[in-house]
Design a protein with these regions (language model features):
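Non-catalytic terminal/accessory segments
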Residues: 1-172
Length: 172
């Protein structure tokens, strides 16, 4: 269902508080649903910092918002938020449920897509994955940069040959 004005107002205040608590602790590589960040800032970061790594991780967590485990999310929140009333309030938002054809449906997992606090809660939940992957990746990032692919080396060599031929042809 559509939240009332009062619910939206309370959610916005909770979102602002959560952002103040967590925003400075998210990984710099995280760009989704964050202030002053977008897919464009993510692409710019890749363009500026790419060093020929050996591997990438790309993912799309299908049905993410529908499948967030409430208990795990609450446990993550409790690591930084000790106020039990705040935790209860967030749990109430998660468990609010919805009305469909005048019948109430409880919510036992997931977050409402389009909910005011859903994006920040998603980032809090996925920050654990970001930190794990950063630590995991560091085990593979040895040396200055990864070895470039053979195809890239061949293309680079061919480009140099063509450039040399062009210089020779224009100088004659």
């Amino acid at each position: 269902g559509v939240p009332s004005f009062d619910d939206k107002l309370v959610q916005e205040v909770v979102r602002m508080v959560l952002e103040a608590i967590y925003e400075g602790h998210f990984e710099d590589t995280s760009h989704g649903f964050r202030p002053h960040r977008s897919c464009h800032t993510a692409l710019n970061a890749v363009q500026k910092t790419f060093t020929g790594k050996k591997w990438f991780i790309e993912g799309d967590i299908k049905g993410f918002f529908d499948n967030v485990n409430h208990d795990i999310l609450i446990d993550i929140l409790k690591e930084r938020i000790s106020d039990e009333r705040s935790i209860r309030l967030i749990r109430k938002f998660l468990k609010a449920g919805y009305l469909e054809q005048w019948q109430f449906h409880g919510t036992y997992s997931g977050m409402p897509q389009g909910g005011i606090i859903s994006p920040i809660l998603a980032n809090i939940y996925l920050d654990k994955l970001d930190k794990y992957m950063k630590e995991y990746a560091s085990k593979f990032d040895k040396g200055d940069r990864g070895r470039q692919q053979r195809e890239y080396e061949v293309l680079t060599y061919q480009k140099r040959l063509v450039m040399r031929e062009l210089k020779t042809a224009t100088n004659n």
